[in-house]
Amino acid sequence: SSKLSVHEIITLSSIVELEGAKAADRKAVAGVFYNRLDSNLYPTLGSDATTYYASKIDDWSYSLTYKELNDCNNKYNTRCSSNTGLPIGPICNPSIDSIVNITILLIN
């Protein structure tokens, strides 16, 4: 994961944007998801934000159903064992802060 394309950086940054509720949290969130890209312990990203996006749900108080959590045909669902790595594209327009946090990880 040390060499991500611009598309992959924006995609990962968009996950960080929605998973990190506050800007102060996004550095840690970026580290977690970046490390999961190369982890044998975490074969998938397991992002709630991508699973909600995959199910076209924008109400985070909604509890995802078993069917939604296990819809592996949707390439945005990063909880499925068949959907490893990043989803097929961004799930939102990430802030500069989220992009910078991912870029710093790539540089270090």
Regions found by a protein language model. Give the residues of each.
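Bacterial extracytoplasmic/cell-wall-associated proteins, especially those involved in peptidoglycan
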Residues: 1-108
